[in-house]
Amino acid sequence: MKLHRDYTLTEIAQLISGDAIGDAGISATGINEIHVVNEGDIAFVDHPKYYKPTLTSVASIIIIDQKTDCPKGKALIVHPEPFNAFNFLTQYFKKEIEQQLSPDPVIHS
């Protein structure tokens, strides 16, 4: 999902009460599951089996369940429940986008 504006690492970490690690200048422009992630996206990982593929993906901000070395050019947010944090953000951003839409759409002919 594309976001209606860029969100900073700090903003995202505060929204989910997580600990930010890495490049504080990184911003998110989208949020997606790892199999469809794009550069600028937020992704999550909550199982050691998937740490390497997620940390080496093009995702810019990764929500993870334990502290680890942050790859260059990325940021991590440590959270005890990455899946729940990711779902919260998805719903939060969806509401933000819906609020940007006009309540009275006009169809032009």
Where are these regions (language model features)?
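Terminal amphipathic alpha-helical/low-complexity segments used for targeting or macromolecular assembly
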Residues: 1-106
